[in-house]
């Protein structure tokens, strides 16, 4: 089974509408909703009747404003409530201040689940992470504890350990794999060695993902060439395959969750967002 997922759903009304077009006119089967977006209620209302669309809570600890009181989560956000935009900072704090971080992670993750849960319109709870932060062991541990304390069970949690073997089979495409993405892939796979115990605790089967090594370059030419190998990889291991994409074009400067001129603003206005949108329309 292959899931075609759009991350970052609901950052703006236009961005959410463009993602929904990938559902109505393309092959999209799931979205990951940004819990701290002011447009979340509107975006979720627009998909409330589409019961077969998978909807995940896109746990976000790096972009926009926290949902907790800023003074309650000082390791995660500045005094104005804006998240520190750093995966590596979270990773470092998980080593240097594990107890304080665990308390604050639980508080913010609980707040984000609480905001999205009533808007799921009867769907089961699904979880993943913005910038794949759920792969940090401390974050996944906090997710486990929040679910346990709330008496919740997730029907799916994304496992962002992407296999490299399907990429290596296509030597003609190697130049299309940004070296920094290969490094990120290896980092996430390494973190997975320490995080998988928490997946077991939650009764989660580790699935497969595609799209990390070519993140920012998920155009139809590459995806159509690589997807069959990823599907064979997943089928052989009886895993669900999730194609992770960001087709939400249309976020204008100053409209997103990030501060104007921030690192995420450049990502949303990148032409690659439109290419990923086009890819989902063609697959």
Task: Label the predicted regions.
Residues 8-9, 131, 247-249:
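Active-site metal-binding loops of divalent metal-dependent hydrolases
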Residues 1-3, 13-126, 136-283:
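Terminal accessory/targeting
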